[in-house]
């Protein structure tokens, strides 16, 4: 995914007894596996896909046990999808979780918050913030990223930080149904023709 040599995501947790070379380290990002899944679907002639995964990343922490933050990753390609399709999915998810007031900032290929930023097209990706806290990154994958995975069409991906999202989520409060159901009434108002509707609405409210 075009990570620079000094990327913190290259600092991995090594497994003592791996099943094979491909599984010898713990993943530090969900994005590579999502790209592999999209590549597999593309090579099997699936015209379009829209996928997601929830899982943990494993980040080294000195001599201690690694951190295991929960993440969510999305991936999609197909003629019906574009940058705004991915943005719409994220907006719907945030709305469902009760996260209001999220802000979107352009990402220029580098990011202090997400090591995966080089994987995205520098002019077609954005970071998601809530109250100044970065909760996600999404956009169109860089042509070199697509070439590395053998994906011959434009593809889009997103990564979201679940702990930060849940911290920003508004807890919903449920109330019992009213004992007496509401009723709807139609009102007929007699007035002069020169009275604006806005004045009537203001008087009613």
Q: Model-found features: residue ranges?
A:
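Extended beta-strand-rich architecture
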Residues: 1-205
